[in-house]
Amino acid sequence: MGRQPLSCPFFFAVGLRPVAEEAEVRALVDFYDTVHLAEVVRLNEGFVSAARYELTEPLDDDSVPSLLAVYGIGSEDAARRFLDRQGERRPVYTPGPPLFYSAPVVWRMVWESAGSTGVDDLMPGKMAMIGMDPAADATEAEIAEFDDFYTRTHLPEIVSGLGYDRGTRFLLWHEFTHPEPGCPRYNAVYEAEDPNPRPPGVPPLSSGPRAWEERQVRWRVKYRRAA
């Protein structure tokens, strides 16, 4: 498949929280890996790649997906065509195992890339995602300061200080499904080719503007690449 999903200008995330017997979960992930991931790319014009991730932290939070599929979208036009195909115009996919239909869908949203540091493309073995909102009462000027600090200062500090190969800031482009009170506005994604965990500890980080310091972190999750 072409560029990796998180290297694309947009990506579509589908996150499930299957709770079932091990054999049922295995049937679900096997279906994703051997049939569904490639089929979604093939049947949606402008989709260029797909990958599946499994949650490593936190394992006990039912509001975040334990199985995450991400699909790279090559352009905004392709993303808009995808929105137009929702409902009755959605592609007809190969039927899956029972858990494919019964597993709770906790995430379903499209994200737009808004700035990156590090390598242009990679095959990540692991990634971290941090969903956040700026200070609730931030003005437009403060949001601009938040964005500038986020991209120019914080992303590079995390990438270099925590051993990631790339950090990318994504903006919520469209929300289909997310637990209340809704999806955060920003999603910082940090990727590393090495799947092994890094020793614990966070290096000193720069202080940011008020909208940054008073940000609300909605979720902080880590995944390993599974397919």
Residue ranges and their predicted role:
Residues 1-227:
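Macromolecular interaction modules
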